[in-house]
Amino acid sequence: MGWLDRKDVLQWIDWVLAQDSEAEIVLHGVSMGAATTMMTAGEDTPEQVKVFVEDCGYTSVWDIFSSELKLRFGLPEFPILYTASATARAKAGYGFKEASALQQVQNCEKPMLFIHGTADDFIPYEMMGTLYNAKPGTNKATLTAEGAGHGEAMDVLGDTYWNTVFDFEGQYMAG
């Protein structure tokens, strides 16, 4: 769900920098990759990590599972989510509330671009605003893909998607 994956990403960053200490790194993820990107963003990353781009990520594992239980099945959080979170803690070493992109974004000082489709029926579009508002500083931006479903912003926006991403990155990278 992104929480343990952030540690893998940190190792990949170290590997890249061992190959090229002057590399400029952008972390860009879609869906679960977006969650991993945001969860990594709250960690202490080297100065060569310049920008984070998240596309249709969620606020926390707890929030997305709670939303899915309600929307898809009409079920409350208790007892299912509490039991599943306790099981995850026992098996994976973390609970669902701990795996929070929202908390990690609050610790992120580096630039971040938030992207989301308005017709996403998996990750609520409103989560983008919550995440954006949690990110400190002014080095942040949003890109809304009108009518785009989950993970469809790239397809719906076409060149606008990539032009926005590259323009945002260009503000913070040497070249």
Describe the residue ranges of each PLM region:
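Alpha/beta-hydrolase active-site loop
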Residues: M1-D20
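Hydrolase active-site cap/lid region
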Residues: M39-Y94
